[in-house]
A protein has these predicted regions:
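Glycine-rich beta-strand-turn "strand-cap" elements at beta-sheet edges
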Residues: 4-9, 25-28, 70-81, 111-131
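Bacterial N-terminal signal peptides
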Residues: 7-18
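Sec/Tat signal peptide C-region and signal peptidase I cleavage site
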Residues: 20-24
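Short, well-ordered beta-strand segments in beta-rich or mixed alpha/beta enzyme
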Residues: 30-39, 70, 74-101
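Extracytoplasmic/secreted envelope proteins and their assembly/folding machinery
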Residues: 32, 48, 52-55, 94, ...
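N-terminal, post-signal-peptide region of Sec/Tat-exported proteins
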Residues: 45-86
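An amphipathic, aromatic/His-enriched active-site/gating alpha helix that lines ligand/cofactor pockets
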Residues: 60-65, 81, 90-125
Length: 131
């Protein structure tokens, strides 16, 4: 009987630890960070590619970036309002995204955009993906 009680208490404690938010370690969730750029109408593909390459280089310079995809709008709906180039980053978790934002390499990239004659504007959306 004593062994049964000991097993019951052990299992109960394990269940409480696994399902109590205060006791169990919280699972780090990835964060998606989408940036969409509008370039000037006279921007050449070479100029845009230089900006894209500089942006892509951040994944090797800043820890916590686990994925980086780029693409060009190909929607036939005509509702992109001049925004054409999409950059989708995945961060390990919110802490990685929060460390990325003020990172010196990210600041250098932002300075490159501010000084670029082809960059017009961007917008950014971050989210934690759920099914």
């Amino acid at each position: 009987m004593r062994n049964v009680l000991l097993i019951f208490l052990t299992v109960s404690l394990a269940v409480i630890c696994c399902f109590s938010p205060g006791l169990a370690a919280e699972k780090a969730e990835p964060v998606r960070h989408i940036v969409i750029f509008k370039y000037s109408s006279d921007a050449s593909e070479e100029q845009i590619q230089k900006v894209t390459d500089a942006f892509l280089s951040l994944r090797k310079k800043i820890p916590g970036i686990t994925g980086f995809e780029t693409g060009v709008n190909n929607s036939s709906l005509g509702k992109n309002y001049g925004f054409t180039h999409v950059y989708l980053m995945t961060f390990k978790d919110e802490a990685a995204r929060d460390a990325y934002l003020p990172h010196p390499e990210h600041e250098k990239f932002r300075e490159l955009l501010r000084n670029s004659p082809i960059f017009e504007e961007s917008f950014v959306v971050d989210w934690v993906p759920h099914e």
